[in-house]
């Protein structure tokens, strides 16, 4: 059959998991390529600032260290092995026959027909419209595996419920058509029930009026399958009877033999590449490559100017590494030279003495860019180059997020009392004091005389509605009322609508025969009646004995060509026959359509180095690749020497507070990511027009397998082709595994000081963290030594007023201070009278004997309130009494109104310097202040003296795989493969069904 046109390519799905195939062998190391030079990628976004830690002590500025040796070039990862072919999906179950529709309304009952002969078995009805199952998630398209033996087709199972649509699978290469499974044998057809006995033909009555349409009859139950009768002789083909109800499914047929492998279908046209799918999970990490040969040392860079010395930053959580910028375009690679013969390894010579640095050569004119060389095999990893001069220190990092307050320290021991200070100058007279607290309630006074009754007050406002009262008890049931008088007969109602016709009732039992009537008179002769119905065919007689075989008759004339018979049911697949004898090698077939792209082969040995071609035009800069996933944080390197302190930059303006972000807990250290899958194919070039598919040729007889061809000799070396157009910048490759740590190189010559770098941009404002819980109080620390007095620092900007802190515990009572001198302030206004004080002690008795106690007098009337006397002059201050014990702290009184601000007093004399107190315990962290924006970078200081070379830092851990790059341009179309060997002959097909007579 002619294959239909290939449909459009589906969307690219998720890449499948790596196949369990074995790891491929590592190819031979190639020659080292020319070092590429690309523009520096953009700076990644800054990571989240870390938590502020305690300020460390400022160390003495050290000399700037030399730039450490560059890390070894990682070996190129091994190409991932092609995954095993995905398992062939099992053939979906055939949908069950659709449910039988409800029976239509029963028509008027016709005359009973004569029972027909058993007709020939009807054709198999069309497959019912079973619910089509949704396609499941497509598995990953792996490389085509060997065709397995086709399993026997099982019986059709029930159609399961449609699952949710899965994610679209990746569109793999079009696989070859697998062998067609054998069709399972159909179950036996259910036995058709025998027709019931015909009823007696009644006399044909006069044709009546057509009756009304009957109600739809109830759906009859499916009859039980009748017992299979003995097969009768085929009778005359009667009219097809109505289709009976579907019988129960037959028993499961025997599994068919494996089907013969189908012929290979024509290769469809290559579909357009689908969109780039989501990156799949990283494959397993390849084996660590061998250490490459030592590369040539790179050119010595110029030492950058030392940057400003940053203030001691607070140590916080390490911020997440910024996303790596896109890799610059790779430099053009020269054509590889011819590989020389491999020499025997020589003995390692002693390193020679370092020569004097040569004079700096003149700057040559830039050469024209060479043509794009073919990508050679990956070169071996170079050894560590000489360490370059130290680069300029980075700009000062952004302020970290305010950290959570530390744990509450333990209560410290109270400090020693300080020395008594020199009395200060007299303060100004303060404002009038607040009202004193009410004194204790005095004893009850004598009862006064009864007052006169006052006038009646005004009427009060109406009260609010009361709440509903509780529910009362249930009342007693009343007596039944007397029966009422019957009412008048109502008017007749309208006639109702005619009801629907009811279902026919069951047939009643036949009644007893009535008495015989009188014999009627003979009627007039009637007209000739209508012809009677055709009688029922008689029952088929028993089969007679077979007669003697007659003589063979003469051959009759050739009949007309019969109609083509219907396709017979596919027979069971026969067993595979033995391979036929080896035939002569067939002629070479015509070039077939290009086959699907095969899996990527192992990298071949490096070819001979071609002659350099003419320089091609410079290509345009490609678009930056997609940002890769952030790599894992490398292990911290050795601390370098501290640089000289630069001049402090001006303070930046305070920015608005940023939103408060939740500080996430540091995640667990991720496992080492495996090498990612190779990048997807690039954007397709201008596709040629696809010609119409030619007619499919008839499959020829399978020939014997041809002899194995000999390996051809090496072809002549091809001429160097013209320079190709510059390719687009490819995606950044996955980072290779870190190589072994190389030995530190020799010190390079000191370079000239570089120009000062550009002023950095102000960083983004950090996120203010939430204040943490108050920690427990720590143990008191040992008193530290008395430090030298610090220099007067610049006055800081006044901060915003913080929230009032919690009230502390009452302090110990201090020694009473000396009374100050009277200030020059004006006399304050007299205060209000205080509450009466407690009753004083009884005075001493005077001379004379005590008199007899008098009788208690009647209580006198309450006298008028006395006038308050003039305020006396303030007496001299008495000597300070001894300090009494600290009383218990009373309850906090209500906060009074804020008093007026008093006049500023004269500045007191400076007291003597007290001894330095003990170092206090660290208090709980205050609320986080809003961090200021990063100030502009200060001017670069002069280059410091060259410091000793620092130790090489430990190589960082492998970064995570980057996102897959954009799809590259399609590769050249592969040449048409030679015709393969002819396969063994297939098994003979099953015999077809006999045609119609």
Swiss-Prot record:
Location(s) in or outside the cell: Secreted; Secreted, Extracellular space; Secreted, Extracellular space, Extracellular matrix
Residue stretches of biased makeup (Low complexity): 102-118, 135-153, 201-240, 360-386, 395-414, 456-483, 591-605, 618-645, 674-690, 719-728, 738-753, 883-897, 931-964
CC per GO annotation: extracellular matrix; extracellular space
UniProt biased composition (Basic and acidic residues): 52-66, 898-912
Location of Phosphoserine modifications: 94, 594
Residues modified to 5-hydroxylysine: 88, 252, 327, 558, 669, 839, 901, 913
InterPro entries membership: Collagen, Collagen_superfamily
GO molecular function term, any single one: extracellular matrix structural constituent conferring tensile strength
Pro residues: bias regions: 1-21, 155-167, 647-659, 803-813, 847-862, 982-997
GO BP of this protein: extracellular matrix organization
Stored Pfam families: Collagen
Predominant localisation class: secreted
Bias (Gly residues): 307-316
3-hydroxyproline: residues bearing it: 692, 969, 984, 987, 990
Post-translational modification: Contains mostly 4-hydroxyproline. Proline residues at the third position of the tripeptide repeating unit (G-X-Y) are hydroxylated in some or all of the chains.
Expressed in which tissues: Expressed in bones.
Annotated stretches, region: Disordered: 1-997
Modified residues (4-hydroxyproline): 15, 18, 20, 29, 32, 35, 49, 64, 70, 79, 85, 112, 115, 121, 129, 135, 156, 165, 168, 195, 198, 210, 216, 225, 231, 234, 249, 258, 261, 273, 282, 297, 303, 312, 318, 336, 345, 351, 357, 366, 369, 378, 387, 393, 405, 414, 423, 426, 444, 462, 468, 474, 480, 486, 492, 504, 513, 525, 531, 537, 546, 564, 579, 585, 606, 612, 615, 624, 630, 648, 657, 666, 678, 684, 693, 702, 705, 726, 735, 744, 753, 771, 780, 783, 789, 804, 810, 816, 824, 830, 850, 853, 856, 928, 931, 949, 964, 970, 985, 988, 991, 994, 997
PANTHER family given in the database record: COL_CUTICLE_N DOMAIN-CONTAINING PROTEIN-RELATED, COLLAGEN ALPHA
Function: Type I collagen is a member of group I collagen (fibrillar forming collagen).
Assembly and oligomerization: Trimers of one alpha 2(I) and two alpha 1(I) chains.
Family in the record: Belongs to the fibrillar collagen family.
Further comment found in the protein's record: These protein fragments were extracted from an ancient bone collected in Haiti.
The protein's name in its UniProt record: Collagen alpha-1(I) chain
